[in-house]
Amino acid sequence: MSSARTVRKDKPRGRHHGLTQQKRQEIKEAFELFDTDGSGTIDAKELNVAMRALGFEMTEEQINQMIADVDKDGSGAIDFDEFCHMMTAKIGERDTKEELMKAFRIIDQDNNGKISPEDIQRIAKELGENFTVKDIQDMIEEADRDRDGEVNVEEFLRMMKRTSYAY
């Protein structure tokens, strides 16, 4: 037997290793519930209802794009594995966005919905960083699209999306 043909047993099987068993079960139940014709697949209309039930509001174009992204046979419908793969990505996006929202609220000390230069100075000091006024001004200008001198939540999320924290 050639060592090149040895199969590794410790490798995770399947495409769903990023999900908890409970989350996978919820996705399976949603799939079965919304596979209304019992075909073993979900079409665009069924997917839209399933996504809303799982807490995602989506446009018809987004639904059709999601199907196109995972529909390997071009049938216009997706099976459970495709649905699970797609939902793993969507849940990851939502979790990352929730984490970014928590970070925004921590930085926005006065809870006015905007990150000010003072907010950045305070959090930097708490983290042991020492930024100059110019450093902070540059950070704000990088993200501040409406040019009000502060960073609102949309600007913050857009900025973070351009970095390694993409959601």
From Swiss-Prot:
> Which residues of the sequence carry a binding annotation for Ca(2+) 1?
D35, D37, S39, T41, E46
Name of the molecule in the record? Caltractin
Q: Where in the cell is it found?
A: Cytoplasm, Cytoskeleton, Microtubule organizing center
What lineage is this protein's organism placed in? Eukaryota, Viridiplantae, Streptophyta, Embryophyta, Tracheophyta
What keywords tag this UniProt record? Answer: Calcium, Cell cycle, Cell division, Cytoplasm, Cytoskeleton, Metal-binding, Mitosis, Repeat
Q: Where does Ca(2+) 2 bind?
A: D71, D73, S75, E82
Which residues participate in Ca(2+) 3 binding? D108, D110, N112, K114, D119
Alphabetical GO biological process terms? cell division
Q: Which SUPFAM superfamilies match?
A: EF-hand
Query: Which parts of this chain are annotated as the region Disordered?
Result: 1-23
Family the entry assigns:
Belongs to the centrin family.
